[in-house]
Amino acid sequence: MRALAVLLLLSAAHPAVAQGFDTVISGGTIYDGTGAPGFRGWVALNGDRVAAVGSGEAPKAARTIDATGKAVAPGFINMLSWATESLMVDGRAMSDIKQGVTLEVLGEGWSMGPYTAEMKTVLARQQQDFRYAIDWTTLGQYLAKLEKAGISPNVASFVGATTVRIHEIGAGDVDPTPAQLQSMAKLVREAMNEGAMGVGSSLIYAPASYAETPELVVLANASAGCGGSYISHMRSEGAGIEAAVDELVRIARESGGPAEMYHMKLSGKDNWGKLPAVLKKVADARAEGLDIRGNMYVYPAGATGLDASMPTWVQAGGIDAWVARLKDPATRAKVIAEMRGKPVGWENLAQSAGDPSKVMFIGFRNEKLRPLIGKTLAEVMALRGTSAEDTIIDLVIEDGSRVDTVYFLMSDENVKATASLPWVTLGSDAEASAPEGLFLKSSTHPRAYGNVARFLGKYVRDEKVDTLEGAVRRLSGLPAERLKLADRGFLKPGMAADVVVFDPATIADRATFEKPQQYAVGVSHVWVNGVQVLADGTHTGAKPGRFVKGPGFGKCPA
């Protein structure tokens, strides 16, 4: 009787119930993204929308998908994606679609606009395996270009604090004048008006590290005034992490907007015990009424470059100036001395890893160096007969790049503890990849292929850090609320038809650090805007993804 009442209610609101839907997903356990317990039922799709959700007998449809024994959830949101370039060359986003990701959120400190003519020239020269014309200027133009070209997932972006800084004052270690800072804030507002989600920073890297807190407050205030949030790779995730959290909280307090920590982690064994202090600072800020959250990838290693193992002053002005300084014997000697000492005002991730065997190279620009992909710093030191510091410096010079590098930095215990926090969402901090073509020229971090699946399999199912309904909320409804998305993140009538069907009993990551380019398993079906992009685990080739606009779109005056 209850099922009949539900169906009749939905029929009144949605006439298509009586007439038949485009697609009905039936027999699965529905997790609607709110954190409510799942229930056995059906989800109906019409066009690009969820038309109805109910229990009991499923209504008629042009196509019915049997989801018996599986979970049906809103499409997952990747809160930290580096699919900026990978989507330019392969819009399928295979590694993420196969995990149920339907929205890639870009913009960790660096964004694909706004650019000056000089920035375009430099970026074109620095392109590696992925080559494309930079025929846009603003961030909104880039995102619109992706949609027009065809992409399988939806895409959104924060505007990069680093990007607007370079736009106005270059890559040097200088402070903006008041007029330049106002121009930077204007660029943030313009990006918000185009649809950016907020402003993002990445403060351990040059030239982002040159920005002082008041500068970041001004940019965060510009974002908050347009409804956006501030999101940050904080100034330290190691010895200085408590001060870094204090800075994030200060920026939230003074800007009046929400703030979020990228890839919440504690780097270096000496810092692993600081997690309780960090969580207390967040709890105190939240009790004060500040909206502080975080996101993470569920691995004990991070991936970045060798720039994160050198003092930031030597990197001022960009890669060409950096390499030129390293070639100067006196400067090189000074850099080596600082790399061997205790870092002051910067993070040395090679030092934090604790041993050269815990630093692995995964990507080079120089073809001659590519045989070193997959080798550790210790192995390359042995091959060359050089010290850790000399090896790092030589590789940067020879490659003319920061060199893509994995650092084993975190404890499994802290990863598990952080993965249990109800205010922490998931972000891969990686490209959307495929084990084919250009992607095979380099390696990657396994998080590119397994972050969501590892969370749902290893951590939720096996280690029970959260309920399944709580985990789905943190992959869908919670990030959608943070981004102020009015029509995504939940399985409710009228919402965008971004849907994933997966098997909670079998979902798992297969990618490892030794063999990272392996797809996850357990996701059978994915829809993006009502179009099926994954059917029985196979990509359909469809590219219905859209540029998802942020809260200031069209209403944020510059």
Model-predicted segments: where are they?
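Divalent metal-binding pocket/active-site signature
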Residues: 190, 196-247
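Histidine-rich, glycine-flanked metal-binding segment
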Residues: 20-23, 30, 34-75, 90, ...
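Bacterial N-terminal signal peptides
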Residues: 3-13
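Metal-associated gating/positioning segment near the N- to mid-region
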Residues: 67-137
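C-terminal cap of metal-dependent C-N hydrolases
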Residues: 28, 328, 417-423, 429, ...
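Acidic, glycine-enriched loop/beta-strand segments at the rims
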Residues: 30-42, 403-409, 414-415, 463-473, ...
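Sec/Tat signal peptide C-region and signal peptidase I cleavage site
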Residues: 14-18
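Active-site neighborhoods of metal-dependent hydrolases
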Residues: 142-146, 151-178, 182-205, 216, ...
